[in-house]
């Protein structure tokens, strides 16, 4: 399995960048609304704290994580939102401190996961490297919500490659959660990275293909921007359909933006 080290390093850097955005905000700004309906900046950080806690539980306490799965199944529509709302009520200073401590513990635990161990999650079980990538994706996406709320445009980084990779790998999942049969044939996905280099997945002679900006593809698969506003294009009926349902995150179909 892949060494989790580089992925954890990217996750740490992404988390630190978001931390820097909110660390010096006046307490009242944590109540600013974000593009996610009903969610403030405090909700966004609270959600990341909660999911980092849950990921830490998945690594360190398999029985405890199984209990969380049972609770989630009992309240599938409100489980995530309820947790974010509860944590958003905590003072910003306490919330930020708790997130810093929790994510730091998670990063260290991911580095210590034995090679070959699969970690339980709300989607398929995954390696420590994949867990770090999933946390990177979510931290980037919710960080984007915070940046949008603050009117900040964040520079694209090479860390987007792992998020794009996750978006490609979850192609079939996006079809399945939308009650559609995944395409039998592979797609070519060819994206332009922030430095102008090309990132590609799939056979070069594939009939169905997706091309465009890597950053915009990441906006798409995290459902942070509407497809009509993005430099992402598809050739082929199945590839075109995928762009309308793509999601790199676990759970039911997202509502998009």
Curated annotation (Swiss-Prot):
Q: Which InterPro entries match?
A: CHP03084, DinB/YfiT-like, Maleyloyr_isom, MDMPI_metal-binding, tRNA_wybutosine-synth
Q: Which NCBIfam families match?
A: maleylpyruvate isomerase family mycothiol-dependent enzyme (TIGR03083), TIGR03084 family metal-binding protein (TIGR03084)
> Which organism's genome codes for this protein?
Mycobacterium tuberculosis (strain ATCC 25618 / H37Rv)
Q: Which SUPFAM superfamilies match?
A: DinB/YfiT-like putative metalloenzymes (SSF109854)
Identification of the protein by name: Uncharacterized protein Rv0036c
Q: Which domain of life is it from?
A: Bacteria
Query: What do the Gene Ontology cellular component annotations say?
Result: peptidoglycan-based cell wall; plasma membrane
Q: Molecular function (GO) terms listed? A: metal ion binding
